[in-house]
Amino acid sequence: MDGMAPDSVTIRKMLQPLRPRGPDDEGVWQQGPLQFGHRRLSILDLSERGHQPMVDSELAFTIVFNGTIYNFRELREELKGLGYHFTSTGDTEVILKSFHAWGQACVERFAGMFAFALWDQRAKQLHLVRDRMGIKPLYWTQDGKRLLFASTLPALLAAGGVDTQFDPLALHHHFSLHAVVPAPRTLFREVHKMEPAHWKTIHADGLTEQHRYWSLTAQRPVEAKSEWEWAEAGRESLMQA
């Protein structure tokens, strides 16, 4: 946040606790005051083309992504029809192209569990995004000099210099809600969880914007459904899930 280039030691420290979760590959990328790190568990594209942080030089986007987009193949075909070309076979690149094609509305097309950070070089904006139900975690903390984020709390704390004063209300939640602390709180006062179904944008000047892109609705259908129709709707939902 102070415009200074981050040191490489900090990001390496943060990546160390992630090794068991991502044993297949490690990557670090830096541009000016911004630095991304990633530990990879290869599942879809097993080649080096799926390496992260993934950089799209043509679109000027860089991403670190944790999760799975289940309908990425369908989205990739749709994007190909719009003229986009792909160099990898996984879902990470689909997120990059989708953001370029549809902007922040792209997340409404994603079926899956995900948390990602995307840097838009031209707009000088960092986007932090979490899936609808908050299946994939994303922690962050910010002071006057830096913004840190990670997919696990140990990785975030490994950076050092993070304020770890306990949050009394979060402790109350922890002991009364079976060890659950609802987002955006964590046990630590200055460490936060991205809320499910939220999109946060941090501008180069430090201005931050956040909005909820989805909410669960429970509404009665306009027309009554038969037992068979309800069963078919349930089957369709299960198949999609």
Features from the language model and the residues they span:
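Cysteine-centered catalytic environments shared across enzyme families
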Residues: 1-241
